[in-house]
């Protein structure tokens, strides 16, 4: 694993240290900023190929976690260094991930070539969480060359993965109906590859045909594949297809992830300033002054963003 050391002496030599670094980023503060900046400095000077980041999205129950686990096992068998970041819904009280490390990956103690971590969304809205964007940079700087980011589920918030990932894999189940929701959310338009998981169940072939028919009218429609994370059928072909797409989309990945981190950081800071203004009463005071005609709305917005 590559070594990344911040000004406080923390190094990403092991997966344990990487986990601690991500925890530091979740807490925020100067130590987190130093870690991220050092990772960015190293990535900017790295001459080798950057990591391939694959966003995995789809409706709950489609088997995203199990499929990601199967893809990771296959990639690891080919000596790829694989990291999985599972974006979980946040607890309102604690801000932590509710589901924990839900990804189905066989534990291999001592294997420094795989890393699994749950990341809290922290109410990020349409964007991925600030932590998820930062964590993707840290795992890349730590030497992982294949990164899966699994989102919560098909919906408007999952469109944030498009900003961050090199490729977007949309996972659908065989039951039908979920593809309509994916179309409404714009995920089918954003996906680079679509897979119907659970091909061992009835209805999988029909789901593939429905998706292909729905995508046929679009420009540059993504390929639709069949796979089963349970019996392993189609997993190797799916990984090969993803790797092939990664080659065609090589270049610009690091800049994309830095832009995603920057956007998420700005959103997080603005949200924190709004929470602060609400808790100390400034938000109510500004609303009162606007209602009284003493202050324009745009001026109040600027004042909140400045934190004054």
Predicted regions and their residues:
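A general structural signal for well-ordered alpha-helical segments in protein cores
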Residues: 18-19, 32, 208, 235, ...
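Conserved P-loop NTPase nucleotide-binding/switch module
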Residues: 139, 151-191, 196, 201-210, ...
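Acidic/polar active-site rim loop that often engages polyanionic ligands
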Residues: 111-114, 188-194, 221
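Hydrophobic positions on the alpha1 helix immediately C-terminal to the Walker A/P-loop
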Residues: 67
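Canonical P-loop GTPase G-domain recognition
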Residues: 193, 199-248
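Nucleotide-state-sensitive switch-loop elements of NTP-binding domains
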Residues: 2-54, 59-62, 71-157, 164-170, ...
């Amino acid at each position: 694993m590559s070594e990344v050391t911040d000004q406080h002496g923390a190094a990403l030599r092991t997966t344990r240290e990487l986990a601690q670094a991500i925890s530091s980023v979740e807490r925020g503060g100067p130590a987190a900023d130093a870690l991220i900046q050092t990772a960015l400095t190293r990535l900017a000077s790295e001459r080798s190929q950057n990591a391939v980041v694959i966003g995995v999205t789809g409706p709950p129950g489609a088997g995203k976690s199990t499929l990601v686990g199967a893809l990771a096992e296959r990639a690891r068998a080919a000596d790829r260094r694989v990291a999985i970041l599972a974006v979980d819904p946040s607890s309102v009280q604690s801000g932590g991930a509710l589901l924990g490390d839900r990804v189905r990956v066989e534990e291999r103690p001592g294997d420094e070539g795989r890393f699994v971590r749950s990341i809290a969304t922290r109410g990020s809205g349409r964007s991925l969480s600030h932590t998820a964007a930062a964590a993707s940079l840290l795992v890349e700087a730590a030497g992982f060359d294949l990164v899966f980011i699994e989102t919560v589920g098909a919906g408007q918030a999952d469109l944030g993965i498009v900003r961050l990932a090199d490729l977007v894999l949309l996972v659908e189940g065989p039951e039908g109906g979920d593809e309509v929701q994916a179309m409404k959310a714009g995920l089918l338009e954003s996906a680079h590859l679509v897979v119907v998981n659970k091909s061992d169940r009835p209805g999988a072939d029909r789901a593939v045909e429905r998706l292909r028919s729905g995508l046929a009218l679009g420009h540059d429609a993504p390929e639709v594949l069949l796979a089963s994370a349970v019996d392993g059928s189609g997993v190797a072909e799916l990984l090969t297809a993803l790797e092939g797409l990664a080659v065609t989309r090589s270049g610009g990945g690091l800049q994309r992830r830095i832009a995603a981190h920057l956007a998420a950081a700005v959103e997080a800071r603005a949200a924190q300033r709004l929470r602060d203004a609400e808790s100390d009463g400034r938000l109510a005071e500004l609303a009162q002054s606007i209602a009284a005609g003493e202050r324009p709305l745009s001026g109040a917005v600027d004042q909140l963003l400045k934190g004054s």
